[in-house]
Amino acid sequence: MAAQNEQRPERIKTTPYLEGDVLSSDSGPLLSVFALQEIMQKVRQVQADYMTATREVDFTVPDVQKILDDIKALTVEQVYKIVKVPSISFRHIVMQSRDRVLRVDTYYEEMSQVGDVITEDEPEKFYSTIIKKVRFIRGKGSFILHDIPTRDHRGMEAAEPEVLGVEFKNVPPVLTAEHRAMIQSALDGSIIENGNVATRDVDVFIGACSEPIYRIYNRLQGYIEAVQLQELRNSIGWLERLGQRKRITYSQEVLTDFRRQDTIWVLALQLPVNPQVVWDVPRSSIANLIMNIATCLPTGEYIAPNPRISSITLTQRITTTGPFAILTGSTPTAQQLNDVRKIYLALMFPGQIILDLKIDPGERMDPAVRMVAGVVGHLLFTAGGRFTNLTQNMARQLDIALNDYLLYMYNTRVQVNYGPTGEPLDFQIGRNQYDCNVFRADFATGTGYNGWATIDVEYRDPAPYVHAQRYIRYCGIDSRELINPTTYGIGMTYHCYNEMLRMLVAAGKDSEAAYFRSMLPFHMVRFARINQIINEDLHSVFSLPDDMFNALLPDLVAGAHQNADPVVLDVSWISLWFAFNRSFEPTHRNEMLEIAPLIESVYASELSVMKVDIRHLSLMQRRFPDVLIQARPSHFWKAVLNDSPEAVKAVMNLSHSHNFINIRDMMRWVLLPSLQPSLKLALEEEAWAAANDFEDLMLTDQVYMHRDMLPEPRLDDIERFRQEGFYYTNMLEAPPEIDRVVQYTYEIARLQADMGQFRAALRRIMDDDDWVRSDGVLRTVRVKFFDARPPDDILQGLPFSYDTNEKGGLSYATIKYATETTIFYLIYNVEFSNTPDSLVLINPTYTMTKVFINKRIVERVRVGQILAVLNRRFVAYKGKMRIMDITQSLKMGTKLAAPTV
């Protein structure tokens, strides 16, 4: 029984290399991993040499499937939360007074604890702290009120106290009955009104909320109240067009009843995606290519043609000496099959992936392999006209191989008249003197290869993605035609194939001509399938834009390097024969196909958020240069990357390009205007608008040094002292008089430190009861409360650090202005047993640091003012209403099987 209950290990699915006529089954993500490995082999050759002299880089190939799963998880992530009560914006600290309390704005109290301490020499930490504070604002204010707790008061609906955003439960126990009745009367007046927002019934009430948080809440509420009906219609209409292009029916399942009166819906993402957002990312061409393969390429099998074709044409005789007959019965190895995959990847991504010949001494010594590859290579690949599958070197090598094959007289001799140039194929052959020069590669016209006298790139009806309007037509085949493999291709032909048959007959290669004539239907089905895959499945935001596609071939010929250079993959000679004898037959559509538009939208949205963050951080560097003395643009690039979702970083860095992005790449990307609209982007921009006031981030440059005695009042009347609610703070109500303030810049401080007079100068200013301000430096501010004497490091702490040391007979001084500053509140508590001098010390206690922030963080208020902060309008959705995120409806529905598959 134990043996039966023992779980069997899960079988790992592997890709078979040879099962009858079917060679292998490759899915999109699997092919993307393979393509990424091969592409990275080429990319690393340059990168590794460059990095040898600098630093080590992790070149491990990332898991593409895991990255896709992580991005899918981002599509269901909500940037808002649905709550019953808003967060507490104001709390109260009870003192010994019966009619006075301290009201604390909890936003500033919590914000002061967010992030690290800012210093002058760590700009990356400064940027990271700013981003954390901005994200705190966005997260704190991104809430939707739903089903708030209410109570009945004399037939009217009133809000429960916890809904108002003010925490005061600790106040009533210390109040008199008269004051408690006054507060209760104010609470009874918090009536909830019925409202109507976008034809939906809602509750409207007045509550309390801090200004930065309310800005985010208001932006979110405005986003919802705007309904976005037109955006939804545009998205659905675009999905219908995309579904028609990709043979996918759009599902209305999620949208069945979203228009009902009891439903509030939120559309967090929009379609179509702005392709400029994706393609503006620096050094992103390889990453976008891999994402295109992973999200769109179908699962398929490599199918061999009918074996009778070769048996009745090439191997019909007992003795076979021709190169084709020799290779007919060969079986590919695993490495050769990998080369076949590369060939089909190059055919599916013309121009983006091009092929070159692998240096293999063994195959170069085998003339039969080279000659066969020279013939089939001219029928498999396109070299010029509008795009190319080959490098110039490979095209020339194929020309030389075809030249050798035509001159290989193994059956009968034919007449050959050589031309004057000595170039490959510069001769006329046969009785009719066929001019073989036409098969020599010409990248300007495409002669000699599949693009010869063929319209292989077409622009017709507008495509869903505006940046990729082209339609690829290998061999002149229209991808709109339906394919029946049993009959398709019969009677079809194209110019290059016809000319190849004519040339083979002229050269006396009748058996080979018969073989190619019989292979023509199989060959046409092959390229018809490839055309359909390119024009339907692979059409994506990750498709290469038309302007870049059109520039690939001219740049390749001219040797110019642009943003989207083609990737060169090496293949062996014999793999061309195996690729010609096998066709990629799609069996299943890619499982990511219907969710791909949503993945593209969330990726573009995250990129837009990153771009907005970097723009504001770069602006910040110009606003406060003194706190960012050693800052470089690369610092805010790294800070934004560190706080971005891991999945988005992984996609951007699929080819490890982040190690090679320079300042020019980054600043060019940041200054480009393209953005992808989304709810997250709208809230991020609003959060940055709130963060423009640095005091809302609990950062300030108005920190003063001033000697002040800690109050030590006499307790002559303890009852009166308690009723006043006595407290002390180093927070200033207003800046000091300007004529009593000495502005201390870095230059002044350094000069006096060099003269050894820094402390003496400050002492003289303090003795004159003046103030010292350190100019232009932002400082991190913390807020703390004490009911006993604060520690000495807070009381006597200075708003700068000054260290001196001696080394080698020289004195060194270090001055830092950017230090942590603490705003403290000391609440005095006394008992009736205290004597009049209980708070008096023989030696006074001094405080040295004063802070001015133009915000009401803490204030002493009377009991009647506790609810005076209820001045914000809130909209809450009724409990019987449904709040529905319809972002998931932006997925296409059921994939239709391709006809005749």
UniProtKB/Swiss-Prot annotation:
Record's GO cellular component terms: virion component
Pfam families recorded: Orbi_VP3
Presence of the UniProt keyword Cytoplasm in the record: no
Record localization: Virion
InterPro entries listed in its UniProt record: Inner_layer_core_VP3_Orbivir, Inner_layer_core_VP3_Reovir
Keywords carried by this UniProt record: Virion
GO MF annotations in UniProt: structural molecule activity
The keyword Repressor appears for this protein: no
Physiological role: The VP3 protein is one of the five proteins (with VP1, VP4, VP6 and VP7) which form the inner capsid of the virus.
Similarity-based family: Belongs to the orbivirus VP3 family.
This protein's name: Core protein VP3
Protein encoded by which gene: Segment-3
